Amino acid sequence: MQDFPQDLKDGLNQIFLSDPTAKSMGVTSFDWAPGEASVRSMLTENFTNFLGVGHGGFLFSLGDIALSFASNSYGRKSLAMKVDVTYHRGVQVGDEVVASATEMSRSRRFASYQIELHVGDELVASATGLTFRTEDWHLGEETWPEDWKKAY
């Protein structure tokens, strides 16, 4: 992999920090590199269902945020086309959930990802995601080096 230009990495970091859904879900920290991302959030009562446990939509959305950061991490604007999630166990108020997305394959137009959500060492949900990679670039196409654009 080529060296990621630091000014562009900083710019993408600011874009990810501004994500309104991540903010509203209390995403407190995230890590990312090209093709991968990890985000974390603590389940609050606002995201429980009528049974008093974590709503599946909370887990789905947290996984989707990790997917969006991972798929946009090369600088190209990418959009989720399909996400298929399996819930393995419920989560409780106060649980810190970590969602990680890892790129499995990437072509010029599409990329696929494996997504895992954990509470501690326990897998609570897993998913696969397929994204569409547009021709548009975050921060303006002209800001990205030509060799980076050709490679990614």
Give the predicted meaning of each segment:
Residues 1-152:
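Terminal targeting signals and extreme-terminal segments of soluble enzymes
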